[in-house]
UniProtKB/Swiss-Prot annotation:
One of its GO terms (molecular function) is magnesium ion binding. It is an enzyme of class 4 (lyase). It comes from Burkholderia cenocepacia (strain HI2424). It catalyses: (2R)-2-phosphoglycerate = phosphoenolpyruvate + H2O. The gene is eno. Binds a second Mg(2+) ion via substrate during catalysis. This is Enolase.
Amino acid sequence: MSAIVDIIGREILDSRGNPTVECDVLLESGTMGRAAVPSGASTGSREAIELRDGEAGRYNGKGVLKAVEHINTEISEAIMGLDASEQAFLDKTLLELDGTDNKSRLGANAMLAVSMAVAKAAAEEAGLPLYRYFGGSGAMQLPVPMMNIVNGGAHANNSLDIQEFMIVPVSQPTFREALRCGAEVFHALKKILSDRGMSTAVGDEGGFAPNFGSNDECLSTILQAIEKAGYRAGEDVLLALDCAASEFYHDGKYQLAGEGLQLSSAEFTDYLATLADKFPIVSIEDGMHESDWDGWKLLTDRLGKKVQLVGDDLFVTNTRILKEGIEKGIANSILIKINQIGTLTETFAAIEMAKRAGYTAVISHRSGETEDSTIADIAVGLNAGQIKTGSLSRSDRISKYNQLLRIEEDLGDIASYPGKSAFYNLR
């Protein structure tokens, strides 16, 4: 039995300089697991609640000492002595202890830190790498990365309304070569921007944040960077967008302030369809407001067979909402953010539900990250096939890519890189 003998919660800082929760779990054998939780900037209204202190004079109200106290008192008391290898039972214990639908009492940040740290300790005790502990012998597929090389929206201080412009390397034989491709395009883009006298400062997720005149201009410039780096747009490298449309939906209209447009759901569907026709876009995330299900249905019917349509704010890693979306034919993919739901067991259930329905699952970071690389192990362990973890700068992003390199090396000859086949939801 891998009995839990000590639990320590603490307040640390994330990549934006805001407090977040870290947890250490010590087992009877002496093995230890440590996990830190991320935090989002653009968040879905139905996400599990991240508990903040609200004390204005300390970290502008964003302290997490209450969440840490929950770990060090009642959570510790509830799970002390439990078997760390019984993840589902441990997470069930946390859920029952919290007793709310949205984890608002204990805080999803407190619960997730414990859930992750326990899994890491159990993997260490079993002598297994974390991805193997999660996925068993079937874990051998590396994910295709969606690399956010231009930031807009809530992730940057510029005129772009769309939040993320991503490159997706798909023709490479290995993850290592895909990562190299992404890095080379990133540096080619930096040179293009510099030559134009545009800003090469980066946003929260490590992508550049220049003031392009339009989304079209941004996408055209990325195509130039792909070619400049020696790759073929549409063959070697595809494009992906995260609209984060909930952020610019006001008074029933999609208000693209940077372009002076106010569009209905049907008009915004036309707008996105035009971009998808003009550029090699393989994936669009949050293309409609999270509550605009009629708009989502329009978008899915229009583009769902040729473009991956990812629900982030739409589904918030929640199986109940995902099930309803599947039944109504909304979207064809789910973004998986571990802190949206708050336990590993619930996270894994969402991934499995998506796969059973023919939806893809994209494992994702948050804009406020730490050096914790657990999501890399989740992506491989559950054979998710896709990961979204930022640009090719900032160590809080690179830590996940570097972990994937280590996993690929550990797998050796049995490692596979799916490329375009990762988008099995497109027919």
